[in-house]
Amino acid sequence: MSMQDPIADMLTRIRNGQAANKVSVSMPSAKLKVAIAKTLKEEGYITDYAVADETKPVLEITLKYFQGQPVVETIQRVSRPGLRIYKSKDELPKVMGGLGVAIVSTSKGLMTDRTARQNGMGGEVICYVA
């Protein structure tokens, strides 16, 4: 069976892994998934990520906890294959009043909503993380 939305699958694996208090989660790797993992690490939502280059590349994400509680409270897919969501720089959402981040795909690559606003760019809103 083919996977219809690999990004939603990635976010679900992270959500389920933290609900089960797993140390890490692994999934098939792709450039966009690695870029999302890089952004999550830069924002402090995950500890680390690595790509194991076996016959099929595997992305391993090390989850982060604070005092036994998952750092990621909510992680939600916004734009999906059946309904793409694009926002201009003025329309980019502030997740939880600025406490969370929206990951945005722009012409300059993947970045947070704050960075996109600073660069005066809009794009496709991939997901919300808080």
Curated annotation (Swiss-Prot):
Gene Ontology annotations of biological process type: translation
List, in alphabetical order, the Gene Ontology terms for molecular function in this entry. Answer: rRNA binding; structural constituent of ribosome
SUPFAM superfamilies assigned to the protein according to its UniProt record, in alphabetical order: Ribosomal protein S8 (SSF56047)
> Where does the source fall among the domains of life?
Bacteria
Recite the UniProt keywords alphabetically: Ribonucleoprotein, Ribosomal protein, RNA-binding, rRNA-binding
Which pairs of positions does the record mark as disulfide bonds?
none
Gene Ontology, cellular component aspect = ribonucleoprotein complex; ribosome
Q: What does this protein do?
A: One of the primary rRNA binding proteins, it binds directly to 16S rRNA central domain where it helps coordinate assembly of the platform of the 30S subunit.
Please report which protein family the annotation says this sequence is part of. Belongs to the universal ribosomal protein uS8 family.
Q: PANTHER family in the record, alphabetically? A: 40S RIBOSOMAL PROTEIN S15A
Subunit structure comment from the entry: Part of the 30S ribosomal subunit. Contacts proteins S5 and S12.
Q: What is this protein called?
A: Small ribosomal subunit protein uS8
Gene that produces this protein: rpsH
